[in-house]
Design a protein with these regions (language model features):
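A short acidic-Thr-Gly-centered motif at the start of a beta-strand
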Residues: 147-158
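Rhodanese-like catalytic fold shared by cysteine-dependent sulfurtransferases
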Residues: 2-139, 158-161, 167-207, 212-281
Length: 281
């Protein structure tokens, strides 16, 4: 499996040669990436889950970020491959997380400087009651189908296609789908207001929202559906899922990621790798 994030868990395994010289080591996954699920599931006691997650990650020597909320868990962890897998096996042993699909990727060096485990009101702050992922998913479009639509310039019903980037301007600066509607936002909470001037131009189109791995576009799609937009889909698996399954067709640039690799190209190769990755985490 190449570098990349899943919309659920995204452990990154790394190894080194004897003598400390780094090497790239691909780590295979037994999971079918087409069965990815978002990490949304009800968590009754987020604090207790976070505390155990932290203790087990510390004991295993893992670094990265774990976010726990009443709506689920999301994380990216890096460490020795077996240590990452053991941690994931612990989480999956709990029935509510048993179906989570994990993608493994690799790095020449540890891309995180420390371990951060946080309890949050939401996995990603949006502050919209009508965007609760526990109430159901918004409709999705598979990467291969979106690539076909991009190629033909419309969806399968001949309807005009608009790609809606739900990420912030820093992320967009690294790349986006060609011709996508991008918004001048710095925080995800600004998205609803930033979309208001564009609502008329979206009315007669099939709108596909997208983000890095699927969490933000899920919430954005749910909110816009509740706000009366019934022509909206979300890209299943986000940009990185698209890269993995399709490549870079219709995409210009890289996809920003929230670790020391900075951004990934459509071949899922990092902008920054090796020892530099440790310095920029």
């Amino acid at each position: 499996m190449r570098d990349g994030y899943a919309p659920t868990l995204a452990p990154v395994a790394y190894t080194r040669r004897e003598g400390g010289l780094p090497r790239r080591t691909p780590v295979k996954s037994a999971d079918d990436p087409q069965r990815c699920r978002l990490p949304f599931t009800a968590v009754d006691n987020p604090q207790a889950l976070a505390e155990e997650a932290r203790a087990r990650a510390v004991a295993a020597g893992l670094r990265g970020t774990v976010r726990v909320a009443g709506e689920g868990i999301n994380l990216v962890l890096a460490g020795a491959g077996e240590a990452v897998r053991t941690w994931v096996d612990w989480l999956r042993a709990e029935p509510r997380f048993a179906g989570l699909v994990v993608k493994e990727s690799y790095s020449r060096a540890q891309p995180f400087q420390r371990l951060k485990v946080k309890v949050k009101p939401e996995l990603i702050s949006f502050r919209r009651a009508d965007a609760s992922p526990l109430q159901g998913r918004a409709p999705t479009v598979a990467p291969a189908d979106l690539a076909r639509w991009i190629g033909q310039g419309c969806d399968d019903k001949g309807r005009r296609l608009v790609l809606l980037d739900t990420r912030n301007r820093e992320e967009v600066g690294h790349g986006s789908f060609v011709g996508a509607l991008t918004l001048p936002i710095d925080n995800f909470t600004e998205l609803p207001a930033a979309l208001v001037p564009h609502r008329d131009e979206l009315a007669d189109a099939t709108v596909v929202s997208f983000c890095t791995g699927g969490i933000r576009c899920e919430k954005a799609a749910l909110h816009l559906q509740a706000d009366g937009m019934d022509n909206l889909l979300q890209l299943d698996g986000g940009i990185l899922g698209y890269f993995e399954q399709v490549g870079g067709f219709g995409y210009d640039g890289r996809c920003f990621v929230f670790d020391g690799r900075v951004a990934l190209d459509p071949a899922l190769e990092p902008l920054v790798d090796g020892d530099e990755a440790m310095a920029t985490g």
